Amino acid sequence: MQSVLVLDFGSQYTQLIARRIRELGIYSEILPYSTTPEAIREHDPKAIILSGGPTSVYGESAILPHPGIFSLGLPILGICYGLQAIANHFGGAVESSSKQEFGRAKILVDRTEGHESMLFKDIPDSDVWMSHGDKVTRMPEGFQITASSGNSEMCAIESFGPKAALKIYGLQFHPEVQHTLYGKQLLSNFLINIAGIRPDWSSKSFIEHQIEDIRQRADKGTVICGISGGVDSTVAAVLVSKAIGKQLHCVFVDNGLLRKNEARKVMEFLKPLGLNITLADSADLFLGRLKGVASPEKKRKIIGRTFIRVFEEHINEEKFLVQGTLYPDVIESQSVKGPSETIKSHHNVGGLPKRMKLKLIEPLRELFKDEVRAVGRELGIPEDILMRHPFPGPGLAVRVLGSLTRERLDILREADEIYIDELKSSGLYQQVWQAFSVLLPVQSVGVMGDKRTYENVLALRAVESTDGMTADWAHLPHDFLAKVSNRIINEVRGINRVAYDISSKPPATIEWE
């Protein structure tokens, strides 16, 4: 399978680059900006893309690619900071721009004789998405301008003449962002027409590759999988089961942090999938360890450690642990690919004990949620399982803000069931990416039955997204919200006020904790 490497310099859009490449049917992988030429050769890519980034190539904190990558003989496309890194390496100049560009801009493609670029084949002058404060001010020798904007004369450059064979291209704008009208066509021109890559990546090929990899890693060893009934862990379990069959033992842990009747429902709809599942009732253990803990980070780490301990109690000779970790989990947990800032740890990444006895198998680690669902369909998993809304690994622990009690968990369960049931009966459930309720550590004054109340505040959350990396708050009908609020306040003892969260990601995250 032919592939592309994306070297990450810390851009918020790096993962979008990988997604857009995969949408073209080409496998992509993200590696740190500092990856050596030797390591790149081991991956055997057909092209390299340099991502954008938050630093300046001329600053003391500049992060630069290994100079040897430009001698590998591979086509290279630099995006934003990647363009500036190319210009810097080949002797050009990059300076702070007196007029920064953030948002839409129009580029003019140079079509004069001798300047025609394969990169801009069939691409007219059009709107692109800019996000930069620096710009190239002196062209590196052996390069030519192929497009410009009102603020960036050297908006697109490429090697030409004696250096044409290098096939090195640079763009000041972001082709991976949807606001760049011909961004996908531009990436296709680079990868297929210039690099000559054959589109051969699909859900089917991903499954075949993972099955082979899982069999090699697990060999004849036994494997344990913590399964929650959510999309991620279910797809991961079915994929691993397809690879090693009876070597896989699944454990569904009732940690006391699940939604109403979740344990029973999960066991019922997973049964037809033929998985070997054991139910572990560990609610007392989890809630005991979480007693008095208010910090969301501490909650996540305690839950991660406790999950592993529970699994270890259910293993005999198992050597591996399967997790449904996804790419957004990894990105938000730690800067594993580049200098991006850690946002929060995930219980199934940063919360794991450093000295756990089990080795990890994470077959979905490089996939986004929509790709996981596509893999699930290829595996034959029913649509009603695949289209369930994401549910966090720590469960309701991160939806009951502050310290946990059984009473507060039960209040949230009752309210959330009403919210989700109303979404489904109104035909809105599948129109949003994720919806849930959050019990706040806040109380408010109210009046019920001519009596003063001082009870809990509940927040409703619903967002629209495709991959969980960015999200917009869902504009649910006011009549619907009024109905849900009225039902919750009247039917759930302990809540006298309901609010609706209208924050997008960024700046907020989807979950509150």
Swiss-Prot record:
UniProt pathway: Purine metabolism; GMP biosynthesis; GMP from XMP (L-Gln route): step 1/1
Positions that bind ATP: S228, G229, G230, V231, D232, S233, T234
EC supergroup of this enzyme: ligase
Record-linked InterPro entries: Class_I_gatase-like, GATASE, GMP_synth_C, GMP_synth_GATase, GMP_synthase, GMPS_ATP_PPase_dom, NAD/GMP_synthase, Rossmann-like_a/b/a_fold
GO molecular function: ATP binding; GMP synthase activity
Chain ranges of the Glutamine amidotransferase type-1 domain: 3-200
Active site feature: C80, H174, E176
All residue ranges annotated as the GMPS ATP-PPase domain in the record: 201-388
EC number(s) from the headed UniProt entry: 6.3.5.2
GO cellular component: cytosol
Record keyword Metal-binding present: no
Keywords: ATP-binding, Glutamine amidotransferase, GMP biosynthesis, Ligase, Nucleotide-binding, Purine biosynthesis
HAMAP family: GMP_synthase (MF_00344)
Role of this protein: Catalyzes the synthesis of GMP from XMP.
NCBIfam families associated with the record: guaA_Cterm, guaA_Nterm, PRK00074.1
Quaternary organization: Homodimer.
Protein's name in the database: GMP synthase [glutamine-hydrolyzing]
Organism classification: Bacteria, Pseudomonadati, Chlorobiota, Chlorobiia, Chlorobiales
